């Protein structure tokens, strides 16, 4: 069982798990190196469940704002280190465990192995050092009395003193496999099977003594009992999104990092312009996501080395973390902020992301369920170290385009509705890209409504002599550019998607209701887990930046965010005012009860990550657009006045008289509402007043809880194998279709219920259709585009 792909499921736990892991290790030739230690051993621990959190909170009360002293302003983020190995792991390793105990690491070894595969591509070497492995250590100590899962005890308290120093009485930090940089990824669950292979009491609880810790399932978002089947998965995805969505403290911390780097840039080039792009601009970032910056100026060549020296001089970044990738497609500087451990990628004169950011934000408005899928999929790939191209995964831009294409071409549902089942969509996404999609012959097209096209057709428009890659995605903004051309590990991603489909489809099947652990185990937790390191890191951020959330001084006037709760019976009401001449926009959370209110003074450019720029998108020229994200705590929203009524959105154009059954234009048959009514969906309308330079009004709605589908696991794209669909002539008057069917949803109207009429009625003559046109409410067949 590959620890990078699959986990031991709750029903599979037993005494033979450790033996099966050893058999897999022997068959793969793993662990036969010089040290005899498994290089993929997981360094992170699963997070405590919400039910067990009070005990952990009690132990960490002094550091969390209790009677103890407050953390120092200069204290680094928690950096837990491992101690003794679990008994189950020692049994699984056998003779390798003795080598693991004697395993030491010198600074020279850390220096030589700390360079990533990105440096190998660029041909540049940075001064190597590793603060987490600078001292010679051993993995286990006989008298330590600490278990492998005691990370949270040391992580709950911020360690004072300089970085790299080991406090007295605490286990030294060690990096097991720096070549893969597992230690830098706090969310990594690589090798989690070793922690799951032993008995639950010995492995997850650290023994059965009185001081044993609570079980760590790694599902801190699970705070209630969910419905059975696919409906429960839908509810759990919503809770996961609300739990992992960025909080105002995290946004404030990232703005401070940007401000420090911007100060260094302004000292060098006073006329330079520093802008933000990437997930920070769109709000689709995880707690450990990086920050992408672009510096605009007048240079013939990007001054990478000059900025690198300035960053070292001002001690902005960890000296060992600064890497210059000057041989990449787009030269960038990669660094890690010294105070917050946030990774930052800096590029020069890269304006490609401006249009890409607007493109993704427009689709986020069009598909209100898109952010939920993206956040789950990002976490799914991040914990498996498949979220970047140079680590063998795919870029976030490729992932977003795949999700957009999936929603565009879904044959049965209208993805623009806010009451679709997220659990159904997630399972079908894994089924499509894990099993059904033909990566060898098919490419993905997003523009013009979306389509699946042959790679031969894409190759005709390819530039620079490139051939279509395994994961071929046509760039919707740059024709001829293949977004996934550098994703050499696309088949690995396909494998994990297939694994996720198998696990989730079994978990939501009717047979799963007979499992003895059906009420205690998390369905989403079978494929996604949150580590305790991420939880401690977020708690440290909230403690340190909780008192710094103030209105941004860069805004001209105060911004008041207003919220009005209404009910819209499952329909999403979207209305917004024209944007200002300064092209500043407001990005709001689509589901969280906390609206975004803390202003960001930095500008956004794109939703691409640093690896996307490095490998996927060639540079182009386009005007700069300043963006920022606003967030607000829930307590502030209760005292704000209600918003004024806002006009409805632009109505959809009238449908044409020809129905083309292709991937671009699809036939949708409305289904009569179920007998069990769906509860009205609370919708929030948020308006922004106060300045003339900022005008944005968005409707924010939480996805409703739809009724369970009778066939939740059918293939989502069975109707898209043909590229040239037949045309059906629609005779008679079609003027009445504009007010009903599919087009009425886009204009904010309520869709009237339509009976389930058979297809034989469409063979009527034209005069009879005209005669009864005024008696119909709407046609059961509506045109999508």
Swiss-Prot record:
Enumerate composition-biased segments (Basic residues).
Answer: 757-774
Primary subcellular site in the record, as a coarse category: cytoplasm
Species annotation: Mus musculus
Query: Which Gene Ontology molecular-function terms are recorded?
Result: ATP binding; guanylyltransferase activity; metal ion binding; poly(A) RNA polymerase activity
What protein does this entry describe? Answer: Terminal nucleotidyltransferase 4A
Q: Which InterPro entries match?
A: MTPAP-like_central (IPR054708), NT_sf (IPR043519), PAP_assoc (IPR002058), Trf4-like (IPR045862)
Residue sites binding Mg(2+) per the record: 290, 292
UniProt KW Transferase keyword: yes
Provide the PAP-associated domain boundaries: 421-480
What is the purpose of this protein? Answer: Terminal nucleotidyltransferase that catalyzes preferentially the transfer of ATP and GTP on RNA 3' poly(A) tail creating a heterogeneous 3' poly(A) tail leading to mRNAs stabilization by protecting mRNAs from active deadenylation. Also functions as a catalytic subunit of a TRAMP-like complex which has a poly(A) RNA polymerase activity and is involved in a post-transcriptional quality control mechanism. Polyadenylation with short oligo(A) tails is required for the degradative activity of the exosome on several of its nuclear RNA substrates.
Cofactor entry: Mg(2+); Mn(2+)
